[in-house]
């Protein structure tokens, strides 16, 4: 079964397009986990327990795991999410040349999908694209303020760079496993990209702490795929869900802290479902 078939089934089962970003910043982990063997894994396990009923996908960002204990925590996290029947999208933004990118693609042995950077061109992404059963989300129009520095540059053809990336992603989609990363903080561009690629699912970050447009994220981020009973795509929130406990009534109480994350995921699911 392909990633997007798995994702469609999960969206239908949970009635949710929420992607929960698992970015366990060590500087923000609650004090009551300080003595855990692997604090990031201990944190993620509790977040998954609290949110899995509302999660279509989990999206760990590789930057928060790039040390020996971190990779162990990531492996445990992926296995635990799979145990809850939730697919995992590794947010690694990988790409390189030749043998290097083949090694990066090996990371997909555990995760179900990955984010990649198109700047080096198709050959840098080919080892990912060749994994037919895995999802490959290509950075297109990102949610960060500096995204426009390069992505909005006008090409000789008159189109902005992000539109060319979307068109190329469609060409690269021979295995029907390509998605695009398009931020909710750029709703007009989100709509434009959807017109270019009507059947490619988007990963839409930026609706949480970054304050992106939730309605546009749903209207344009979800693809109407002929092989799926539901529209397919993901709307991600990371800090807005996993650190919701910091603003809870009892942030030092474990049940209250992680209960707040579950409530935040449920609220986002309900908010997004208004527009589905």
UniProtKB/Swiss-Prot annotation:
Q: Which PANTHER family match?
A: OROTIDINE 5'-PHOSPHATE DECARBOXYLASE
Name assigned to this protein: Orotidine 5'-phosphate decarboxylase
Does the record bear Hydrolase in its keywords? no
Q: What gene, per UniProt, encodes this protein?
A: pyrF
Q: What is its EC number?
A: 4.1.1.23
Say if the entry is tagged with keyword Lyase.
yes
Upper classification of the source organism reads: Archaea, Methanobacteriati, Methanobacteriota, Stenosarchaea group, Halobacteria
Annotated pathway: Pyrimidine metabolism; UMP biosynthesis via de novo pathway; UMP from orotate: step 2/2
Question: Sorted alphabetically, which Pfam families does this protein's record hold?
Answer: OMPdecase (PF00215)
Q: Source species, please?
A: Halorubrum lacusprofundi (strain ATCC 49239 / DSM 5036 / JCM 8891 / ACAM 34)
- Recorded family membership: Belongs to the OMP decarboxylase family. Type 2 subfamily.
- One GO-annotated biological process of the protein: 'de novo' pyrimidine nucleobase biosynthetic process
Q: Which PROSITE patterns match?
A: OMPDECASE
Task: Show the catalytic activity.
Answer: orotidine 5'-phosphate + H(+) = UMP + CO2
